[in-house]
């Protein structure tokens, strides 16, 4: 999985019941259940106790586009599965703290609204990785989206301790998502109209 890099932000709109702004833009040519992906992102942000007015953009792109971004921002050749471009710098809590400390506030005080940034996913790479891992593509996309959001929240996996923390949290978030909400649609097909 790719790391974090600075980047642009695009805001979106969500329904009035859940004011969190999560925009999903699919420019990949691959059909993805975008409302379900937005619901997953909302679940992750809710579980991480992110301010309900936070803004997040998820962009789905094709292989050449993510390869270009990967080279430009990470200095690495070839396509990757996920990139995260944070806007407001957030840092993970110190070891041993609970989730109420995630972004510097305590229970009952949601803290300031923030622009989290952009998560860029490549369904083509996700499909290939899912095939290699012998798991559903939807599971791979869920994992990559969650992974990218955690990068936006300041988590990284360069060091063994960071890796254990980030991937442990990622697994917990995905388990709670699948238990409470169910997986996103298994329909990931090439969009022939575009």
Model-derived regions, located:
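An acidic/histidine-cluster motif and surrounding catalytic segment
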Residues: 1-141, 150-194
């Amino acid at each position: 999985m790719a790391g974090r890099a600075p980047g642009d932000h695009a805001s979106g709109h969500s329904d009035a019941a859940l004011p969190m702004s999560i925009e999903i833009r699919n420019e990949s040519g691959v059909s993805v259940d975008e409302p379900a992906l937005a619901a997953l992102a909302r679940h992750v942000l809710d579980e991480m106790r992110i301010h309900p007015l936070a803004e997040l953009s998820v962009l789905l792109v094709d292989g050449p586009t993510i390869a270009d971004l990967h080279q430009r921002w990470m200095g690495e050749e070839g396509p990757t599965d996920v990139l995260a471009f944070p806007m407001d710098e957030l840092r993970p809590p110190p070891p041993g703290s609970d989730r109420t400390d995630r972004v510097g506030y305590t229970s009952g005080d949601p803290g300031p609204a923030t622009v989290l940034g952009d998560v860029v996913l490549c369904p083509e790479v996700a499909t290939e990785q899912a095939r290699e891992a012998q798991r559903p593509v939807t599971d791979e996309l869920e994992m990559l989206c969650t992974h990218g959001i955690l990068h936006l929240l300041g988590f990284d996996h360069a060091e063994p301790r960071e890796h254990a923390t980030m991937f442990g949290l990622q697994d917990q978030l995905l388990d709670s998502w699948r238990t409470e909400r169910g997986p996103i649609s298994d329909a990931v097909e090439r969009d022939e109209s575009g």
